[in-house]
């Protein structure tokens, strides 16, 4: 995974932006009591306000994250509409010609144009281990708050990157927040042949928080202001936009926004980013915030199914 490779040199420039007050996110937090103890996490109310939870992309990835890798979903590439579910062994048993015929049969059965791209996506519950990741959310939320950074980002990144596995990606990203080595160094972490602070949760959280505070949020604002788009930093669409910068890099996000030429900042901008590519902003970049939405939905369900008590951190 590539986090702002094009900004490693840029990161050496001082980009300190005034941090928000540490109590600014109290209204977004909840205390969840379970048999294992009490955890403070971010609530998911914003997902339901503008019906983000009903978007087919969010529903698709939610199902994929919970689905075993021995199964797959047949889906429309453009909007992730689910057409069918089947065993992956049955799909793989077909010849390429048979697979093409099967795709065409799905198009005809669902009234889709003949050139509609049909994807076959396998389940990924072997990677997304939410029960194992859950204990780290409280630590991530607390760490980001200490550094004056919206803890929603900590929760989202931890859910997506699944730190329970602690794998190094093919591009070199590592640690709970999947930081690239050059980016980690530019944010103050030691990464060399003998020491890699990315494997330490607290140091990795520090590096990710600094990256978001010093680069991602300022660059997101710059891109939006270039297009004269207004924003509120606690709006869900803005947070998702910042996540795109975190994952794909500001230059790539700027390129896709230039292509879209949006007239307002809203859910529609995020949905347009899911449908467009430019520079290095491709399929993986499009998927990143879809995964974030799906992961938050799964967390919401998991918390409400397993908790004994939920209380707001700020009285309303």
Segments predicted by a language model, with ranges:
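Substrate-binding/active-site groove segments that recognize
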Residues: 172-193, 204-216, 267
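Active-site microenvironments of hydrolase-like enzyme catalytic domains
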Residues: 238
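Active-site metal-coordination segments of metallo-dependent hydrolases
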Residues: 129-130, 194-205, 279
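Cell-wall glycan-active module
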Residues: 3-5, 10, 15-159, 167, ...
């Amino acid at each position: 995974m590539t986090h702002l490779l094009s900004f490693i040199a840029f990161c050496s420039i001082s980009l300190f932006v005034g941090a928000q007050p540490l109590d600014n996110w109290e209204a977004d937090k909840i205390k969840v009591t379970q048999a294992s103890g009490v955890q403070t996490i971010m609530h998911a109310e914003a997902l339901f306000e503008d019906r983000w939870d009903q978007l087919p992309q969010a529903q698709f990835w939610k199902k994929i994250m919970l689905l075993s890798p021995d199964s797959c979903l047949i889906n429309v590439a453009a909007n992730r509409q689910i057409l069918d579910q089947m065993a992956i062994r049955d799909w793989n048993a077909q010849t390429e010609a048979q697979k093409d015929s099967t795709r065409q049969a799905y198009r005809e059965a669902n009234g889709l144009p003949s050139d509609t791209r049909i994807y076959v996506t396998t389940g990924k519950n072997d990677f997304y281990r939410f029960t194992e990741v859950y204990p780290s959310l409280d630590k991530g939320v607390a760490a980001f708050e200490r550094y004056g950074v919206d803890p929603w980002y900590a929760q989202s990144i931890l859910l997506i990157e699944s730190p329970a596995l602690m794998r190094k990606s093919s591009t070199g990203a590592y640690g709970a927040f999947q930081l690239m080595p050059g980016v980690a160094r530019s944010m103050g972490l030691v990464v060399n042949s003998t020491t890699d602070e990315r494997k330490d949760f607290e140091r990795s959280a520090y590096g990710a928080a600094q990256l978001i505070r010093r680069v991602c949020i300022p660059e997101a604002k710059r891109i939006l202001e270039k297009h004269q788009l207004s924003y509120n930093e606690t709006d869900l669409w803005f947070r998702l936009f910042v996540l795109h910068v975190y994952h794909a890099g500001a230059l790539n996000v700027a390129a896709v926004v230039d292509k879209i030429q949006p007239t307002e900042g809203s859910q529609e901008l995020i949905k347009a980013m899911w449908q467009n590519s430019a520079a290095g902003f491709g399929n993986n970049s499009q998927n990143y915030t879809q995964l974030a939405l799906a992961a938050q939905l799964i967390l919401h369900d998991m918390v409400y199914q397993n908790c004994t008590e939920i209380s707001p951190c700020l009285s309303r």
